[in-house]
Amino acid sequence: MCGLNVFVSSRPAAGPPDPATRAAFAAALETMHHRGPDDTRVEFGDGVAFGFKRLAIIDREHAAQPMHYHDRWTVVFNGEIYNYRRLRLELIREHGATFATEGDSEVLAAAFHYWGVGALPRLRGMFAFVAYDTWTGTVHAARDPFGIKPLYLLETVDGLFLASERKALAPFSGPDRGALDTDALAHYLSFQFVPEPMTLHRQVRRLPPGHRLTWTPGGGLRLERYFRPSLRPLHVRPEEAHAVIRDALRDSVRHHLNAEVPVGAFLSGGVDSSAIVALASEVKPDLHVFSAGFAHDGYSEIEVAQDTANQLGVRLTPTVVTEDDVIRELPRIVQLLDDPIADPSLIPLYFLAQTASRYVTVALSGEGSDELFGGYAIYREPASLAGIGRLPAGLKRGLRGLAHTLPEGMRGRSFLQRGTTAIEERYYGNARIFSPDEKADLMRFTAEPHTAVTAHLYAETADVDDVASMQYVDLHTWLPGDILVKSDRLSMAHSLELRVPFLDQAVYAAAAGLPTELKLPARGRATKHALREAMRGIVPESVRERRKLGFPTPTRIWLKGAIGDWVAGLMAGSGARSLLDLEYAQRLLADHRAGRADHSRKVWTVAMFCLWYAIFVDGTIRPAGSWSPSRPRAIIEA
């Protein structure tokens, strides 16, 4: 896993970049030093620049990047191709391809040389890459099907810029002040993250998951989707489905263990991480696993994880996070994310990755399981609302009007509201923060509604049940916009490569055809039923039957203590009041601290934006540990 940046000029005949541009490009690369501390290289040519920070995992001695192939292609690649050995043999057999290294980056370059965009469906892994055709001046780039690896892009009159993190584009995009995308901010207040392909900088966008781009000087940018996840239920026998899931996940885990560096895993004690650890320990009995928790009763997974580790026979190293740790590191965490994410679970993830990086260079984790196998409790909502949904339309309208007259927090109010609201209006992801009415009170600007993000997703799933539609929405919003962003940034912050076996194409295929009744049986409260059954006999029974835990985070408690004081001060002095009514947010905080209501998620969402604003716009907060690009590190320049 690595960091890349690329510049291709709209005027290639102008020659190599001038000294000022070269210095700015090298300095921008240094903002991503954490992504690849093992090797730094930059190359400049006529109208092009390539920068690469390498975290060496495969063929550590020889597979440096940028990678050149057949005097035609220059490739920079962030990620891992797990089936590269098989692809290498196919390229040799079909085309007589030759190789100078034993790594996957050269295989990727050769695959693109011989197969072109037809290589993309053959790739099994996580990737974001840029391939420059020196013969035609064309830029090709692509991102893996689910968006595990990031790729940001900026197109200006000067040319095309691409990078693994948005901060590496800052010298070329200009400051966030005056360029803030208020539609993106409005969506952040709804979703708790900025949905792809948007960023808070209106000029910078992300290449969407499962997409490729081509760009030529004078020809502009063209995007094309090469992968679209589909959740179309099939008629399958439960026993067969469970066997397919088990075999696919076992094979995926074995491929994800391939590395020339120490490999460990995250363990929460839930079925997802326990399944990965159990299957990994079949191959690697000495597997080292890691868990995190907080110094608050009821907010730690460590005891559960330790019990699971003992049953699986693996070594666990725990991490306990304190409030002082949070106050000290939160500015750095927000800076690493590039755009704010108000998901409190990113805090334990940061410290978990920090601890793991002291022992291993690669860690396996359970992201993606909930979206594929139906792991969120909210997916049970359509069944619970089915009765009210069958009422006549006129009666439902009357009940909806009644619900709005009931006091906030009154028992039954939310049930009536949600039961009389169409799913495409009521469900827009796993973390609905501010409602449209609340956003109208908070925002000092007008913006497009949240349905601008989700409407086309519901249109694409009009022929499936509500649960499949909800999963589809999460696969396109919550997973790439929240889960995978925090996983990538907060692991790479510590030069740790995080791998996610559940997002392997074969595991996805095993999950895609599951009917809802195999994921969420009508009886009981279990989620991910098919996965739990597939893991029977592999993970301990106590784990297999345990309900989903997530990363429990005590934000509700924090906001009533020292962290609440810190948040109050942050809001009081924030320049973000030009965009948000912070007096409104401060009233929410006051009500929360007085115990009149639980506004922790809303307050946290506003606070994280205020912190982001102080770092990226006002510059009033400079996180500890920030890299100053004023003096680049030693660089190998070609």
Name each region found by the language model.
Residues 1-337, 349, 353, 536, ...:
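Cysteine-centered catalytic environments shared across enzyme families
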Residues 336-340, 568:
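Active-site proximal helix-loop segment of RNase H-like, two-metal nucleases, encompassing DDE(D)
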Residues 145, 157, 351-409, 461, ...:
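Active-site adenylate/phosphate-handling loop in enzymes that bind or generate adenylated species
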